[in-house]
Amino acid sequence: MKSIKRIGLCISLLILIIFATSCGSNKITGDSKEEQIKKSFAKSLDKYPTENLEEFYDKEGYRDGEFEKDDKGTWLIRSEMKIQLKGENLESRGAVIEINRNTRTAKGNYIVREVVEDSDGMTHNHTKRYPVKMENNKMIPLKSIDDEKVKKEIEEFKFFVQYGNFKELENYKEDEVSYNPEVPIYSAQYQLKNSDYNVEQLRKRYNIPTQKAPKLLLKGSGNLKGSSVGYKNIEFTFVENKEENIYFTDSVYFNPSEDK
């Protein structure tokens, strides 16, 4: 009888130990995953700022099996401001450029887009692309442009990676950090103030028709340690509702080159 009681006691203790260890380990794993997400973003954001885009010719990105051995890779950089006021169409202006490390050339487009909704509620994209190249850290149109406003915008355009700065990221107070391992996708959201450096820089360069301070949303997919097929996007959302939308998006990718 005593032996049975001892066995029963041992089993009970073992169950308690397993339960306690399991609960503790889930908490540690959760905290660890949150830190991994922050570190993953911090690693990609350390490229901000890179004032001279030509430095990307010599910058190495994350490489995996998608790259051929002799492919140095291509950086894809995109920045875009989108504004939709109440009762108006969504308008966006921005640029995308591919910096090929093999050929040491950079080409892309300055893009002006308007999303129009017709009487049937169908949306239509009216998009104009102006081919550009980069020389001496400046965007130069590859074709003549009659629109003086667009011509000036291209001359003055800077990608966010050229002036954005995330050195204070660790001091930001996050609203939410999420992770879905099945996809996998992950994100971190922060409420910013208008006094934040990046917000001031955006207001300096764009006519942002609201005084609301934005939320910063960092979105990523793929392996947290890095992936050439995943993405990491930055979004500053000033206004987001059914009638109005004001937000800025930015991304810097490192991909296998198409010329390989």
Swiss-Prot record:
Keywords: Cell membrane, Lipoprotein, Membrane, Palmitate, Signal. GO terms for cellular component: plasma membrane. Pfam families: DUF576 (PF04507). Its main location: membrane. It is found in: Cell membrane. The keyword Signal applies. A lipid is attached at C23 (N-palmitoyl cysteine). The gene is lpl8. This is Uncharacterized lipoprotein SA0404. It comes from the Bacteria. Residues 1-22 form the signal peptide. InterPro entries: Csa, Csa_sf. It is a lipid-anchor. It comes from Staphylococcus aureus (strain N315). Belongs to the staphylococcal tandem lipoprotein family. A lipid is attached at C23 (S-diacylglycerol cysteine).
